[in-house]
Amino acid sequence: MPIFIDRRLNPKDKSLGNRQRFLRRAREELKRSIRDKVRAGGIAELDREHVVPIPRKGTGEPTFGDDKESGRRQHILPGNRTFSSGDLIPKPGGGGGYGSAAGTTESEDDFRFVLSREEVLDLFFEDLELPDLVKLNLKQVLSFKPRRAGFAASGAPTNINVGRTMRNSHGRRIALRRPKQAELDAIARQIAELEAKPASALVRERIAALREALDRLERRRKRIAYVDPVDIRFNRFDPQPLPNANAVMFCLMDVSGSMGEREKDLAKRFFVLLHLFLTRRYERTDIVFIRHTHLAKEVDEHTFFYHTESGGTVVSTALEEMHRIIEQRYPVAEWNIYAAQASDGDNFAGDSERCIELLDRKLMRLCQYFAYVEIIDERESHIFGATENGTSLWRAYNAVDGKWPNFQMRRIAAPADIYPVFRQLFARQPDLRKSA
């Protein structure tokens, strides 16, 4: 039967076991509190420590007790100096409001629990994932990772395992009874002591015997090396093929003049949430940021979120830039390719047909998943309730949505819509995204 010993150190002033047990019990309450903050527009504050209030009544430990309605018990109730048999006990006094008077009973106030940044992100993104991250038909695997596979008797000098080598050397010296230096030093001292005494036949005979023994031990010591080539061990590494699960996410954001500050703010909040999700849940995920007006270009993270450049609107330039980067840096045989696009739906006349052509003929054949988010006015959310109504880009993308199952499109009208839309796009169950 395996025995697992948890040797992790407790955080400062905390009990790790109790903390994890509480997180399991209060998981749903904690997730609800975090999501309420995000719906209120606090996405930028998600990547930090949080103080979450939890009702105290939900934190009690379950206990076993006697059933007062059954069984037979004998007990003695203590007397008192205030009441006699038959007296009525008055109700406890209270104030004029809804609260109760001061007393010694247990309070039902909220209890505040501090969650670390890692715990917040783990709870928030617990049931989300990139769809179809590992391809079903993997092509030839070209990348390998060295993995420790024990020891070998030959190898490169840089891979010598000193500990295992000295262990083998020590065992061999014991087995072959290699003389120790202390034994030779002891015989040499005896010879020196005898030579200091007056010479006699017995002393000379004893010195000759000791010299012969010393010579024999030295010869044996030279024959049995301290470290023999047979002792040397090298760390052995076997090449382990890496699964073809590298992923790249293309973030395409419209920053043209038609996108006002409100629309840009909602788009940036969506991409902040996406960026946190990718960096927290996946170790090897490249993120490519593309901003576009009438021109599109790849930018760094800071420029993507904070640059103020504006201009006309030609959405197809962003799709063309994405296709160019895929051909240059991300072979489809080695990468899972994803894309998320945010725009207000305004586009140059005739360019929406070009977008359909790029998606149908090129990008959708390369992408595992493509998500389009359209930023609309809150009043438009009531007018464009049906998916077939909307901007020219929305109507054009509707044709793509009906043809490609790995294409999804949603609308965002207010900060409170960001998280529900994000969950619909990246829910763990693929069928929920279509039905949502």
Curated annotation (Swiss-Prot):
Disulfide bonds: none annotated. The keyword RNA-binding does not apply. InterPro entries: UPF0229. It holds the Pfam family DUF444. Keywords: Plasmid. Belongs to the UPF0229 family. This is UPF0229 protein mll9637. The lineage of its organism: Bacteria, Pseudomonadati, Pseudomonadota, Alphaproteobacteria, Hyphomicrobiales.
